[in-house]
Every structure is written in C-alpha cells, then in structure tokens.
Amino acid sequence: VQPVERTYFHQVQDVFEGFVIDVAGTLHSTAHGRGLKVWYDDSTREHYEAQLIRVDGAVVLEIGFHAEYPKVAENDAVLGRLLGEEQVWRGELGDEPEAGVFIGVDRWRRISEVWDEPDPDDVDVAIEIAARLADYVSVLEPLRRA
C-alpha cells in the first residue's frame, strides 16, 4: 500500500476532532501516510481508524472500530458487547458496517466499512472520511464505555 501524502490524513484529523468535541473521554489521535487512528483515554487496543489497506490486490479505505487485543477471546468479548447493542448502532450507522473478523488479521475484530481509495487532492472526501469516522465514534464510544 502506497502511503497517501502525509498531509491528507492530517486534514482528516483536523476536521474529525471538530466533529467529536462532545464525546466523553480524553481523545488521542495520530495521523500518518496511510491513515488516522483515534482512541479515548488509555484504550489503545479498542480504537477507531480510517486507514488504507489492501484487499484482493486493490487499495481501499477502511473506516470504523477495531478491537486489537493479542487474544481472540478478548476481541470476541468486545465485539460481543457491541453486537448486543447492534440495534442501537445500526440505527445510526446503517447497513454499511460489517461486524466480524478484521481484514487481514484473523485474531482481531472490527465494525467497519470499506470505501474506494480516496483521491488525496479531494478535500471534500477528506471531510466525508472525518464525518464518517466521527459517526462511528459518536455512536460506538458510549456503548463501548457502558
């Protein structure tokens, strides 16, 4: 996967942070050439990302929530709690999110969706990415903390 221009995901980060100002907890975020990672408080193993990944040889953008503990059982427990509230988050996020095994790492879990690779010159798409990631955070973070 070729990194997108470094400043692109920094643009996403700047816009994203404005969208989630009312979400409880201490926001941490890091932008890099292939994406943006966001977590609250000390919860680095349970986080949100907008990141470029490769699927069947194509570069795509994955947006959503990840549980990335070393043990499958821990990740399954996190996903299970969120699936117990699926009616709530589906009502807000729609049919696009897929819940299950992480793309490329079988032991991790996700609630996320895949978009076409973004054009790094398209500021409007950067705003859309930030808004969609903020949707995930705004809906899932209160459920994750419950």
Model features per residue range: what roles?
Residues 2-109:
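Polyanion-binding interface signature
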Residues 89-146:
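Charged, low-complexity intrinsically disordered regions
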